[in-house]
């Protein structure tokens, strides 16, 4: 059983009134249990760190495992919060500064924004933070279980109905009846805000260089840019963990390059070099080109 399924099986049935502190304790305890029972997964973290020339000592492996667990806490958190409570949580814990200014400007002008995110830091907080600040979002993702998919969609509707958040629509890759590429293209044509990952392999990915290794990346964002004919903004967005449930959102617009996917990956590389333990993808099988 994967870590995601292990945690969801135990926690999605909890009372929705479970407080954030209790939820966090339960996620961390469940994750620690899983890692104890699956030593090969700790070895995977170490192997992936060293494959990229990053520190692979026990302290770093412990930190990486802890950050993987926090990813699931941040993913589940909105399911256990009322809209007002989650809005207050984000306002109190997320520092956004002027990171949203360019996106807000593009939204007012009806210009499409491609918000490229990676498996780094508290990525699960990016979309709700955009929605909190009035940006309607279409988010491309995969839900590991139908139960989580249904719960997330229902909660997104509740959040939008509350007036605290702009609407969030999920484009679920691999869901029966969903042609994700066509739906992503439709968002771009409408001048919407599309949030999509760029550091994983799909049929549309291209080879890029990351930390001295050739990997697959982009997940089709370069194709969407060509479809938009330059009438869009592309930015890399990162939600860095800065402390105990404190976060900083940064966005970096990508312009003036013929290789936008490589430019995105270079932004990710800087973040990973600074905080390798926050790169969630260390938990996965890295999409090396040579493999």
Q: Model-flagged regions — what are they?
A:
Residues 106, 159-163, 228-231:
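Alpha-helix termini
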Residues 1-117, 122, 159:
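Membrane-anchoring hydrophobic helices of lipid-metabolizing enzymes
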Residues 81, 123-125, 147-149, 203-206, ...:
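Short catalytic/ligand-binding loop motif for oxyanion handling, primarily in non-cytosolic enzymes
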Residues 111-174:
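Catalytic core of membrane glycerolipid acyltransferases/transacylases, capturing the structured
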Residues 94-98, 168-176, 255:
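Short acidic-hydrophobic, aromatic-tinged amphipathic segments that line or gate anion-handling sites
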């Amino acid at each position: 059983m994967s870590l995601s399924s292990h945690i969801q099986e135990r926690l999605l049935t909890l009372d929705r009134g479970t407080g954030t502190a209790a939820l966090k304790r339960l996620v961390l305890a469940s994750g620690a249990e899983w890692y104890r029972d699956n030593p090969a997964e700790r070895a995977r973290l170490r192997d992936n760190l060293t494959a990229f020339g990053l520190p692979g000592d026990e302290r770093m492996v412990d930190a990486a495992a802890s950050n993987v667990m926090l990813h699931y806490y941040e993913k589940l958190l909105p399911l256990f919060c009322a809209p007002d409570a989650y809005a207050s949580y984000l306002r109190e814990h997320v520092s956004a500064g002027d990171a949203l200014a360019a996106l807000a400007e593009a939204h007012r002008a009806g210009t499409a924004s491609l918000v490229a995110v990676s498996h780094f830091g508290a990525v699960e907080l990016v979309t709700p933070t955009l929605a909190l600040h009035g940006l309607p979002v279409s988010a491309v993702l995969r839900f590991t279980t139908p139960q989580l998919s249904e719960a997330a969609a229902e909660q997104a509707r509740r959040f939008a109905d509350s007036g605290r958040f702009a609407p969030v629509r999920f484009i679920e890759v691999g869901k029966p009846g969903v042609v994700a590429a066509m739906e992503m293209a439709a968002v771009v044509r409408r001048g919407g805000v599309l949030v999509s990952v760029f550091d994983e392999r799909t049929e549309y990915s291209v080879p890029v260089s990351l930390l001295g290794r050739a990997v697959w990346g982009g997940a089709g964002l370069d194709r969407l840019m060509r479809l938009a004919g330059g009438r869009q903004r592309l930015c890399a967005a990162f939600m860095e963990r800065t402390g105990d449930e404190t976060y900083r959102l940064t966005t970096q617009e990508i312009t003036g390059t013929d290789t936008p996917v490589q430019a995105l990956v270079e932004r990710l590389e800087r973040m990973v070099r600074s905080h390798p333990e926050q790169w969630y993808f260390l938990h996965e099988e890295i999409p090396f080109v040579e493999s």
